[in-house]
From Swiss-Prot:
GO terms for molecular function: DNA binding; DNA ligase (NAD+) activity; metal ion binding. The gene is ligA. Keywords: DNA damage, DNA repair, DNA replication, Ligase, Magnesium, Manganese, Metal-binding, NAD, Zinc. Residues 618-696 form the BRCT domain. This is DNA ligase. PANTHER family: CHROMOSOME TRANSMISSION FIDELITY FACTOR 18, DNA LIGASE.
Length: 696
């Protein structure tokens, strides 16, 4: 007799459980367990079954995330436990004062010995929107914004659309209130803005603004289309632990035992427990530290990683780890005494756009630059910021006289994010692109299909000449130590250097007469120039500054042809035979050497005694064709040394991780590249692993 198949109720339960597990793997552990297509197929199966059996649909089904009607307005929610803000620290003195207050209080309560240091749980301060999730009997019952800390807005319908938020928890207490942050990854934010711009809709200023705007949509269907994420970092109400979970007792003072409503006795332990329930918790960079020195070391370490994280943070948070100690420390006004937010220097600030000028780059690219009223942002005072190109200015609707938001992240060049429209003055002026180069007067043209306008003056343009010479003297090209920007400015302005070949005719006598150049410095520079008379062919090709020809491409072309003469005479078809050289690069090289003036420069270099050396073939072929990506700081090798060794063995080095990456080589403070490699299944090596691969 054939065995009966599962009932619709059993099939629906199985599909829900399977989808729930996939959601946990993806959103909690950042470890997708099935391809997107397979996940989508499971959802379709569940939707079909529920359509056939509507009586079996429950509010916590994965299919019920979207579907609520648009709201007229958000209701109010009174927080059972206030959502307090944290006290802030902005410098080392603030952190040390906080640690001393905590230690003194705990010693006074008999919870810390005189020779002991306080143990803290350190976390990232996510730059998103604070949210409270209330689960009743394991089901998501309500979600609310922080609001004023006492009362927030009911955003339950919108929170339900975020796939990383579990609609049901297994093994949860009767009532569990979870606090956390809703945010948007930077890459997803950029994609959203591109979509918004393509539709002619408003673009967002930053990921936080996008997350807040998405969550406060009255129509949950719009929120469902936005790439929001949620991370839990604390809790509020907790009542009715599951049966079988033993009662735990705290000792808030020596000899005093109090029954606890919580299953763990440390903050870190509670976060682990929330993760075990299936909630997304951002545990990766969290760490326990002791004393003020430990806190400051954590702050510095995270500061170095900040630019590589996939999401924005605006600081770190220190919390006394032991929950009994937290209770003894208590609260003051609107903030806990046991926690502190240590802010990074602001990455965004507001200032006035005084004017827009244009800069001319090495290839003639015209870049609009904002002249700003001085503003302190990202740890430095900023007076200039990039506006990228004319299209970006139009897209952002930035006008001279506007109050604008300026962003500076890590070592990234400051940029104008957008205007504060409500502060726009009546006399704000739109930017008009110049038609002639401000340096040489040549026509400015914008090639069809490109966003960048360019000066047509070539090396006749002093600005292009300066940037070309600076590029050629750089470490990855001819590596002429001592030939920097200020010296090149003097040489070009004096009309002493008109082309790269003129560098090789400089004498110590004339150099010594220049500003800030003594006899010894001049002699050292001439010696460095002499050393650069026998560069590797690939370095010289890269030094010429041919558009679209980077360091690696120049080396590959040099190895393929073996001499400058053969490269200069190569047809586009011959250039396309070089591995990884496509039509754009081949066409660019061909056009460069079709220009008589450029061929003349190569001839002048030869006359000055510059004789490029053929590129050495790889020492072995063990890594032939394999692409490596480097991240973090290695204990012994510099990144340049590791790159040189990989290239010598026939490998390639790229700046970003993709499916084509053969290995990711990591050092200390590896950032988002490591996460991407793990997502794609790219093998990860440390320095020793790389050495072993190289046979060293």
């Amino acid at each position: 007799m054939a065995q009966a198949g599962p009932t619709p109720q059993q099939a629906i339960a199985r599909l829900r459980a399977e989808i729930e597990q996939h959601n946990i793997r993806y959103y909690v552990h950042d470890d997708p367990s099935v391809p997107d297509a397979e996940y989508d197929a499971l959802m379709r199966d569940l939707q079909a079954l529920e359509a056939e059996h509507p009586e079996l649909v429950t509010p916590d089904s994965p299919t019920q995330r979207v579907g609520a009607a648009p709201l007229a307005e958000f209701g109010s929610v009174r927080h059972a436990v206030p959502m307090l803000s944290l006290g802030n620290a902005f410098d080392e003195e603030d952190v040390r004062a906080f640690d001393k207050r905590v230690a003194d209080t705990l010693r006074g309560a008999g919870l810390l010995g005189l020779d002991q240091q306080v143990e803290y749980f350190c976390e990232l301060k996510l730059d998103g929107l604070a949210i409270s999730l209330c689960y009743e009997e394991g089901r998501l019952a309500q979600a609310a914004t922080r609001g004023d800390g006492q009362t927030g807005e009911d955003v339950t319908a919108n929170i339900r659309t975020i796939k990383g938020v579990p609609l049901r928890l297994h093994g949860a207490p009767r009532v569990l209130e979870v606090r956390g942050e809703v945010l948007m990854n930077r890459a997803e934010f950029e994609r959203l803005n591109r979509t918004q711009a393509a539709r002619g809709e408003k673009v967002f200023v930053n990921p936080r603004n996008a997350a807040a705007g998405s969550l406060r949509q009255l129509d949950p269907r719009i929120t469902a289309q936005r790439p929001l994420r949620f991370f839990a970092y604390s809790w509020g109400e907790v009542h009715g632990l599951p049966e079988g979970m033993p009662t735990r007792f705290d000792e808030p003072a020596p000899g005093v035992r109090v029954a606890s409503t919580l299953p763990r006795d440390t903050h870190g332990g509670m976060l682990d427990w929330l993760a075990e329930l299936g909630l997304p918790v951002n545990l990766r960079h969290n760490h326990r530290e002791r004393g003020a020195d430990g806190l400051l070391a954590f702050y510095e370490r995270i500061g170095k990683l900040r630019a590589d994280l996939p999401y924005d943070i605006d600081g770190v948070v220190y919390k006394v780890d032991a929950l009994p100690s937290q209770r003894v420390l208590g609260f003051v006004a609107r903030a806990p005494r046991f926690a502190l937010a240590h802010k990074f220097p602001a990455e965004e600030a507001v200032t006035q756009l005084l004017g827009i000028e244009v800069q001319v780059g090495r290839t003639g690219a015209i870049t609009p630059v904002a002249r700003l009223a001085p503003v302190f942002v990202g740890g430095v005072t900023v007076t200039n910021a990039t506006l990228h190109n004319e299209d970006e200015i139009r897209r952002k609707d930035v006008r001279i006289g506007d109050t604008v938001i300026v962003r500076r992240a890590g070592d990234v060049i400051p940029e104008v994010v957008g205007p504060v429209l409500e502060k726009r003055p009546a006399d704000a002026r739109e930017f008009v692109m110049l038609t002639a180069c401000p340096i040489c007067g040549s026509a400015i043209e914008r090639p069809e299909g490109e966003a960048i306008a360019r000066c047509t003056g070539g090396l006749f343009c002093a600005a292009q000449r300066k940037q070309t010479l600076l590029h050629a003297a750089g470490r990855k090209a001819l590596d002429i130590e001592g030939l920097g920007e200020k010296l090149i400015d003097q040489l070009v302005d004096a009309d002493r250097v008109k082309s790269l070949a003129d560098i090789y005719s400089l004498t110590a006598f004339e150099l010594a007469a220049l500003e800030r150049m003594g006899k010894k410095s001049a002699e050292n520079l001439v010696a460095a120039i002499d050393q650069a008379r026998r560069p590797a062919l690939g370095r010289l090709l890269f030094a010429l500054g041919i558009r679209h020809v980077g360091e690696t491409t120049a080396r590959d072309v040099a190895r393929h042809f073996g001499s400058m003469e053969r490269i200069m005479d190569a047809s586009e078809e011959a250039l396309l035979a070089v591995p990884d050289v496509g039509g754009v690069v081949a066409g660019s090289i061909r056009r460069f050497f079709a220009e008589p003036h450029n061929r003349e420069i190569v001839e002048q270099l030869t006359q000055q005694g510059v004789h490029p050396q053929a590129e050495a073939e790889p020492e072995g072929t063990s890594l032939a064709g394999k692409t490596f990506v480097l991240t973090g700081t290695m204990p012994n090798w510099t990144r340049d040394e590791a790159t040189r060794r990989i290239l010598a063995a026939g490998g390639k080095v790229s700046g970003s991780v993709s499916k084509k990456t053969a290995y990711l080589v990591t050092g200390e403070d590896a950032g988002s590249k490591l996460t991407k490699a793990q997502e794609l299944g790219v093998p990860v090596l440390d320095e020793d692993g790389l050495k072993a691969l190289l046979g060293l």
